[in-house]
Curated annotation (Swiss-Prot):
CDD domains: nit
GO cellular component annotations of the record: cytoplasm; mitochondrion; nucleus
Protein name: Deaminated glutathione amidase
TM region positions: none
Tissues where the protein occurs: Detected in heart, brain, placenta, liver, skeletal muscle, kidney and pancreas.
Signal sequence extent: none
Function as written in the Swiss-Prot or TrEMBL entry: Catalyzes the hydrolysis of the amide bond in N-(4-oxoglutarate)-L-cysteinylglycine (deaminated glutathione), a metabolite repair reaction to dispose of the harmful deaminated glutathione. Plays a role in cell growth and apoptosis: loss of expression promotes cell growth, resistance to DNA damage stress and increased incidence to NMBA-induced tumors. Has tumor suppressor properties that enhances the apoptotic responsiveness in cancer cells; this effect is additive to the tumor suppressor activity of FHIT. It is also a negative regulator of primary T-cells.
Gene transcribed to yield this protein: NIT1
Organism: Homo sapiens
Domain of life of the source: Eukaryota
Stored PROSITE patterns: CN_HYDROLASE, UPF0012
Catalytic activity: N-(4-oxoglutaryl)-L-cysteinylglycine + H2O = L-cysteinylglycine + 2-oxoglutarate
Assigned EC number: 3.5.1.128
Transit peptide start and end: 1-13
Active site: 86, 161, 203
Length: 327
């Protein structure tokens, strides 16, 4: 089943910023193995990105097969970059299984993804790899590592999730990520890609605007939050947080998500999406595994920042420099 989502007319934006060029874009949401697809856009020269939605299980090879199918479809449709969600490699039943299934960055699974990137000729955002770091022997804990591969399969950036999700939501059950995971020590400077400069984050990080502001002030044009939101927080907070991060940073926001039931103990909300710098959801996945596509218009982003120069109007003398730019 296919569904088209078209950017609505920005009547109020045109009134606010009469010189602002509003791109007329359409994007496509697809389930795996569609029979035929077409992208309707008046700006086909703009870079195309694909956002993949999956239901990971403890079966790593089956998960890879599912992700590879979506990545190959994204490449066939002309995407230059495909985003995979947090825990694209697996979602285990408990912390002990998580540690058992984890691998180092130089392990077999990441090698399969480097080969996939080379085969398809596109960049991959691997949104949350269960990484056995160099301190594995000492800590017996892993990192939730966002890995960015270029089209030649080389690792160009790694970001280890800095905010761990230790929460207890009524109706959703407790989560204590720190039982098996170490927090990352630092942020990663934005990385230049064919779609624009990308700032890396992971899931729960989106609740801390300082991180997003720091990445934006360091030059990010696209913020990405690969996630595995639950069934209670998802409907209440998912879209609201993503749109807020896009509006306050004037960045595109790309959020690949886990969806559906992973096993008897866990399910995820889904609703992967792309939000533009005005805060409009310009692409959204349908229910179940699949992908959605959106074009990134950096000229639109720059015009919006000129017409609404919020970063020039900040008052750090009053409230400090929240989200201090990265060195």
């Amino acid at each position: 089943m296919l569904g088209f989502i078209t950017r609505p007319p920005h009547r109020f934006l045109s009134l606010l910023c009469p010189g602002l060029r509003i791109p007329q874009l359409s994007v496509l949401c697809a389930q795996p193995r569609p029979r035929a697809m077409a992208i309707s856009s008046s700006s086909c020269e703009l870079p195309l990105v694909a956002v993949c939605q999956v239901t990971s299980t403890p079966d790593k090879q089956q998960n890879f097969k599912t992700c590879a199918e979506l990545v190959r479809e994204a490449a066939r449709l002309g995407a230059c970059l495909a985003f995979l969600p947090e825990a694209f490699d697996f979602i285990a039943r408990d912390p002990a299984e998580t540690l058992h299934l984890s691998e180092p960055l130089g392990g077999k699974l990441l090698e399969e993804y480097t080969q996939l990137a080379r085969e398809c000729g596109l960049w991959l955002s691997l949104g949350g790899f269960h990484e056995r770091g160099q301190d594995w022997e000492q800590t017996q804990k892993i990192y939730n590592c966002h890995v960015l591969l270029n089209s030649k399969g080389a690792v160009v950036a790694t970001y280890r999730k800095t905010h761990l999700c230790d929460v207890e939501i009524p109706g959703q059950g407790p989560m204590c990520e720190s039982n098996s995971t170490m927090p990352g020590p630092s942020l990663e400077s934005p990385v230049s890609t064919p779609a624009g400069k990308i700032g890396l984050a992971v899931c729960y990080d989106m609740r801390f605007p300082e991180l997003s502001l720091a990445l934006a002030q360091a030059g990010a044009e696209i913020l990405t939050y690969p996630s595995a939101f639950g069934s209670i927080t998802g409907p209440a907070h998912w879209e609201v947080l993503l749109r807020a991060r896009a509006i306050e940073t004037q960045c595109y926001v790309v959020a690949a998500a886990q969806c559906g039931r992973h096993h008897e103990k866990r399910a995820s909300y889904g609703h992967s999406m792309v939000v533009d710098p005005w805060g409009t959801v310009v692409a959204r996945c349908s229910e179940g595994p699949g992908l959605c596509l959106a074009r990134i218009d950096l000229n639109y982003l720059r015009q919006l920042r000129r017409h609404l120069p919020v970063f020039q109007h900040r008052r750090p003398d009053l409230y400090g420099n929240l989200g201090h730019p990265l060195s």
